[in-house]
């Protein structure tokens, strides 16, 4: 647990007692702070009270002497409408922060690596952490990826905190100047929370704020917004541009399946990504390039980075190889809750049997059209099954309405093991999970369980 110096007897308000909120309260109380904690949910309040945490309605509380509100990232303080507690904090002239800001206050001498972007940040965060750990560095990894940062161990001067940073966290973090800051990509997302695309981009680019003297910015070069950001920062810090395509001078990227470093006098082939089986697809080429650039900036040798990438294992529910049963590989990409996310999954394989469906995001499926030839057959689940079947039918892709994963997985296996079957079964739903599951994680766990049954019967 992190203890925060200088907080003894200070009055601190904490709003939101979930995954990050409870560890925040525990750390503050262990630091001697007088905490006033609240959550809009009675269950969360009761859980906190059972731990002996002082639960106080922050709307009616006395804010005299409170100069900080630690607000859960999921609770808005600006758009689309500020939470009443955030408005109360403003009236009291209290600074609104998140738990990551408190980590920076508690561990000012540590090394910080921050990773953000619309897509790919969890994989890149996990890959950077794996490379650093494999190289013998003392690290903690978490943030938006989890676990909560105030549950970390204190690492001190030579320790490295590897933090996935959401736009929500970045707009409430002021105490950290990242030694290595990674921005992978930007596309419209969370616009309701940031007002417009410009507000979203502004939140993302806060990852480059601060005044560390030896700051490295690793920035994706594959979309217009990030290229503009790189150009803006070029005269302020050292920038390494990364791409999933062939890299130009000064860049890291991919030539075919080879990861290539062109930041030196001569191009260096780092490794063939075919030898990193849990980093499939063009999108992972950019993730690998970013992880390489970030860890090189921290002094890890290219050979050590290549060796670590070969042993990296994918995060759960993100192109996760679950098992191979009777020669058929099962891939869990339950995190793909939109058609755009499923595009990346389809680009990773030559031919798949696709399991998709759930609760439609109501954005249409046209983004998938260029990749439909990769689908040998689709097995569809959930409320969106009919909608997706109609879309696929217009493009000549055969589909079966299976309704549930319990039916879809064995049906997909039967087809995959036939003479004409594709040898990859891909769960990449292109839909939210909430019609059948509480979360995409539960959906992915269910997929794993049904695949395990196949193996038991093989």
What annotation goes with each model-predicted range?
Residues 18, 41, 145, 222-223, ...:
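Residues in the short beta-alpha loop(s) of Rossmann-like NAD(P)-binding domains
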Residues 3-11, 22-31, 271-375:
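Nucleotide phosphate-binding/pyrophosphate-handling subdomain across enzymes
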Residues 365-423, 458:
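C-terminal helical cap/extension that packs against the catalytic core
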Residues 34-39, 140-141, 162, 241, ...:
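Short beta-strand "acidic-cap" motif of Rossmann-like dinucleotide-binding folds
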């Amino acid at each position: 647990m992190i203890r925060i110096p200088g907080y003894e007897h200070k009055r601190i308000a904490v709003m939101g007692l979930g995954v990050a909120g409870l560890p925040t309260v525990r750390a503050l109380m262990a630091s001697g702070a007088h905490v006033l904690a609240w959550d809009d949910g009675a269950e969360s309040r009761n859980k906190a009270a059972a731990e002996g945490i002082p639960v106080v309605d922050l709307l009616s509380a006395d804010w005299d002497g409170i100069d900080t509100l630690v607000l859960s990232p999921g609770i808005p303080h600006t758009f689309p409408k500020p939470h009443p507690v955030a408005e109360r904090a403003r009236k009291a002239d209290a600074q609104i922060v998140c738990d990551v800001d408190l980590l920076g206050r508690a561990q000012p001498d540590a090394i910080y690596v921050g990773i953000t972007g619309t897509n790919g940040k969890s994989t890149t965060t996990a890959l950077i952490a794996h490379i650093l750990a494999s190289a013998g560095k003392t690290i903690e990894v978490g943030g938006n990826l989890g676990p909560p940062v105030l549950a970390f161990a204190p690492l001190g001067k030579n320790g490295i905190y590897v933090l996935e940073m959401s736009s929500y966290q970045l707009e409430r973090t002021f105490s950290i100047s990242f030694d290595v800051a990674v921005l992978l990509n930007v596309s419209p997302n969370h616009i309701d929370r940031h007002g417009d695309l410009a507000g979203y981009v502004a939140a993302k680019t806060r990852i480059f704020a601060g005044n560390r003297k030896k700051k490295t910015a690793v920035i994706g070069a594959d979309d217009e917004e990030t290229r503009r950001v790189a150009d803006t920062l070029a005269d302020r810090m050292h920038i390494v541009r990364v791409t999933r395509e062939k890299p130009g001078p000064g860049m890291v990227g991919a030539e075919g399946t080879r990861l290539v470093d062109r930041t030196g006098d001569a191009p260096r082939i780092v490794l063939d990504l075919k030898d990193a089986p849990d980093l499939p697809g063009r999108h992972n080429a950019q993730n690998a390039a970013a992880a390489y650039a970030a860890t090189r900036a921290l002094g890890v040798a290219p050979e050590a980075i290549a060796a670590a990438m070969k042993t990296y294992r994918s995060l759960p529910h993100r192109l996760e190889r679950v098992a191979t049963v009777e020669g058929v590989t099962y891939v869990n990409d339950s995190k793909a809750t939109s058609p755009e996310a499923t595009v990346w999954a389809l680009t990773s394989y030559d031919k798949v049997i696709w399991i998709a469906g759930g609760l439609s995001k109501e954005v249409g499926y046209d983004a998938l059209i260029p990749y439909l030839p990769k689908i040998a057959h689709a097995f569809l689940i959930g409320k969106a099954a009919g909608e997706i079947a109609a879309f696929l039918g217009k493009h000549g892709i055969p589909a079966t309405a299976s309704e549930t994963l319990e039916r879809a997985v064995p049906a997909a296996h039967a087809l995959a093991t036939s003479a004409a079957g594709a040898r990859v079964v891909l769960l990449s739903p292109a839909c939210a999970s909430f019609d059948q599951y509480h979360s995409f994680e539960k959906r992915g766990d269910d997929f794993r369980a049904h695949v395990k049954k196949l193996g038991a019967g093989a």
